[in-house]
Amino acid sequence: MRKYETVFILNPALDEEGYKANVEKFKGVIENSGGTVDNVDLWGKRKLAYEVKKVSEGYYTLMNFTADTELPKELDRVFRITDTVIRHMIITQE
């Protein structure tokens, strides 16, 4: 099992409930695949450094998790097919 960190930005058109529901969805993907979520840090709505997909702000979330090496590929797939995700990044912690 390895430690990973992901940051994802969600569409600002979501309300607070939609934002938290999406975060829970991604936590569920990790936990249902045998991983554990170590930390979730909700940064809230912030301005983007540059416009992405015609939006200039978004809901930022930092999530630390522990999982096997296949889980980041599945999480990346889920991020890509979720319309509310503007940007995401998954890195390995050392």
Swiss-Prot record:
GO biological process: translation
GO cellular component annotations of the record: cytoplasm; ribonucleoprotein complex; ribosome
Pfam families per the UniProt record, alphabetical: Ribosomal_S6
Alphabetical list of InterPro entries matching this protein: Ribosomal_bS6 (IPR000529), Ribosomal_bS6_sf (IPR035980), Ribosomal_S6_plastid/chlpt (IPR020814), Transl_elong_EF1B/ribsomal_bS6 (IPR014717)
Molecular functions per Gene Ontology: small ribosomal subunit rRNA binding; structural constituent of ribosome
Keywords per UniProt: Ribonucleoprotein, Ribosomal protein, RNA-binding, rRNA-binding
Family membership: Belongs to the bacterial ribosomal protein bS6 family.
Known function: Binds together with bS18 to 16S ribosomal RNA.
NCBIfam families: S6
Name of the protein this chain belongs to: Small ribosomal subunit protein bS6
